[in-house]
Amino acid sequence: YLLHKKLELYPKQHAAIISMTKEEAERFNLQRGDTEGLVNEPLSIAGISCSVFISEDKEKVKLSWRSRGDFAVNEICSKYFNGGGHKNASGGEVFGGNINEILEQVRTILKNK
């Protein structure tokens, strides 16, 4: 479902976004760990060098970023999403955040990258 219906591709930015609301997680009875590794899937698409998985629970919006090459996702996570990590594998979270607002913010960041 998430790869089929929720995958957004941004070819000019060499990026992809997958998002999952808390309602979708409940609808499919997803448990912690069920989406592990999902953020890596778009990197197998030709021309995609950055992938973001955005998920929501009752308390926060969580972002997982993966990239290849010189696309430094740790800088984005530390600057915008209270996170950090490695150059090609980073994450962040926004407590009390709205997933739609965060999704729009990620789109804007990627379009300006």
PLM features per residue range, with description:
Residues 1-80, 85-113:
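Hydrophobic helix-and-loop "lid/oligomerization" segment in the mid-to-C-terminal part
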